């Protein structure tokens, strides 16, 4: 019997979960400024929702999916990414209806699952924050969404981020480029890695972003997608580039970037930063104008991105970025004697109901041990409550940093601790 966590998963303990809550709250605040609303979808979906939209030949579907048959013999998969479930929800709930304002903007947060080799910043259960925007084919939507990602990364403190940009064009441009790539790579097939030999038959564009050395050599002189764009595709990409420049967002054209999912068209992008000599993608996404119709909805443009929370936190740690997390207690009550037990319970509850973060001793320890706990909790103020204080109704409240003290009534603490808190040099929000 295994009583440990499964391989590729982690327990997020309190010291770490505070960072997660900060990142999630920070993302919510940024997304709200751009008029995005949260959507929550199931963590498991029908297998076809993922396989048909992400692509039957992608690594996600062929190698990495957690899928199974449930007791009703339904083929189920744990979601490996966030876009397909959100699109499925958009169509199933008829959010394309005329009365729903367009563009429709959604964000999501939650666990995703892929069976892959666990490594730094990459787990089998990982967490993603993402956004999806439906109903606008305007290149300004591409740019606004990319700018929102840049805004988030800059404000949270990620350093040295570079925006890599490419286009896959419309279906006609992509088909022409696909054939040109097949014609170029077929004579080189024997020099490719085994995976890329398979990709050449199924999805040749995926050979371009292979990390294998032999594949990188093979594609060095490959044709560029930019040479196969028709007028519509070229105009869209030119507009995206111009608007990014208007907003002062620097970018690098990366024609070997294709993204790992089949549903993209036109603009695709990645934000990349270097950590210990390795390029790490922190956020990526693009346009997917055919996906809503693929799920049975009307022809609807889409654009979005996703970022991995574990990867983001790893980069912040490696770059020495300290998140401004407030963990300190406002009040710690040291309790002395059985006669003070009930009053301490009443007092700590009254403080919490006034909005203060408060804790008390429950273990009947010596005062020295209780004072140490107050220090460990970084308590701003300290109240020592014994039987004599209960009898007199008066107690000392101490600033646990400066040691300044004030003598006050228990009734005042129960009803208006803010006044005491401010008198000792702290401010209430």
Swiss-Prot record:
Coiled coil: none annotated. The keyword Aminoacyl-tRNA synthetase applies. It comes from the Bacteria. Keywords: Aminoacyl-tRNA synthetase, ATP-binding, Cytoplasm, Ligase, Nucleotide-binding, Protein biosynthesis. InterPro entries: aa-tRNA-synth_II, aa-tRNA-synth_II/BPL/LPL, Anticodon-bd, Anticodon-bd_dom_sf, His-tRNA-ligase, HisRS-like_core, HisRS/HisZ, HisRS_anticodon. GO terms for biological process: histidyl-tRNA aminoacylation. Pfam families: HGTP_anticodon, tRNA-synt_His. One of its GO terms (cellular component) is cytoplasm. It is found in: Cytoplasm. PANTHER family: HISTIDINE--TRNA LIGASE, MITOCHONDRIAL-RELATED (PTHR43707:SF1), HISTIDYL-TRNA SYNTHETASE (PTHR43707). Belongs to the class-II aminoacyl-tRNA synthetase family. Homodimer. This is Histidine--tRNA ligase. It comes from Streptococcus pneumoniae serotype 4 (strain ATCC BAA-334 / TIGR4).
